[in-house]
Amino acid sequence: MRALIQRVSRAEVTVEGSSIGRIGPGLLVLVCAMRGDPEDAAEKLAARVAKLRIFRDEADKMNRSVQDIGGAVLVVSQFTLAADTRTGNRPGFSSAEAPERGEALYLRFAEALRALGLPVETGAFGADMKVSLVNDGPVTIWMDSADRA
C-alpha cells in the first residue's frame, strides 16, 4: 500500500457538496492499495502511520506522533498514487489493486487506525471527492508498505 501523509491543522472531504469527513489537527492520509499487497499490508501501514513522529515537541523538533498529540486521521482513497509516469504523457494505473480488493484494504487500513485508538474519518471509496486541507509546516511524507519488510 502507498500513502501520502500530510500533517494538517484541519482537513475535510466532500462528495456532491456534502461534507462526509472532517478533522482538526492530525493527519490527512491519501492511500492506495497496490497489486500484490499482502493481506497484512493495511495493518502494518496503519501501525507505521500512527507512530510516525512528525509533530513538534516542546523543543520544536518533530518528535511526536498523531497518537501523542491526541490528533485525528482523515483517510481518503486515491488510486492515482499508483501512477506510472515513466513513459508518455498519460499516466498508467495498472499497478493499482482491483477496486474490490482495493476497497477492502482501504477499509482495513481505516479500521486498523481506529483499533490503535485514533479518531478516524474517511472519504468515499471510488467517489469524486473534493479534499480541502491546511497543511501544517508544510509536512508531507511518502510511505510505501513495500519499502519495509
From Swiss-Prot:
Q: Which UniProt keywords apply?
A: Cytoplasm, Hydrolase, RNA-binding, tRNA-binding
- Specify whether Signal is a keyword of the entry: no
Q: Which GO terms describe its cellular component?
A: cytoplasm
Instruction: Tell me one GO biological process term.
Output: D-amino acid catabolic process
Instruction: Tell me where it resides.
Output: Cytoplasm
Top-level taxon in the UniProt lineage: Bacteria
Q: Where is this motif: Gly-cisPro motif, important for rejection of L-amino acids?
A: 137-138
InterPro entries referenced in this protein's UniProt entry, alphabetically: Daa-tRNA_deacyls_DTD (IPR003732), DTD-like_sf (IPR023509)
**Reaction(s) catalysed by this chain's protein:** glycyl-tRNA(Ala) + H2O = tRNA(Ala) + glycine + H(+); a D-aminoacyl-tRNA + H2O = a tRNA + a D-alpha-amino acid + H(+)
Q: What does this protein do?
A: An aminoacyl-tRNA editing enzyme that deacylates mischarged D-aminoacyl-tRNAs. Also deacylates mischarged glycyl-tRNA(Ala), protecting cells against glycine mischarging by AlaRS. Acts via tRNA-based rather than protein-based catalysis; rejects L-amino acids rather than detecting D-amino acids in the active site. By recycling D-aminoacyl-tRNA to D-amino acids and free tRNA molecules, this enzyme counteracts the toxicity associated with the formation of D-aminoacyl-tRNA entities in vivo and helps enforce protein L-homochirality.
Q: How does it assemble?
A: Homodimer.
Mind telling me which PANTHER family this protein's record contains? D-AMINOACYL-TRNA DEACYLASE 1, D-TYROSYL-TRNA TYR DEACYLASE
Descriptive protein name: D-aminoacyl-tRNA deacylase
Identify the species of origin: Paracoccus denitrificans (strain Pd 1222)
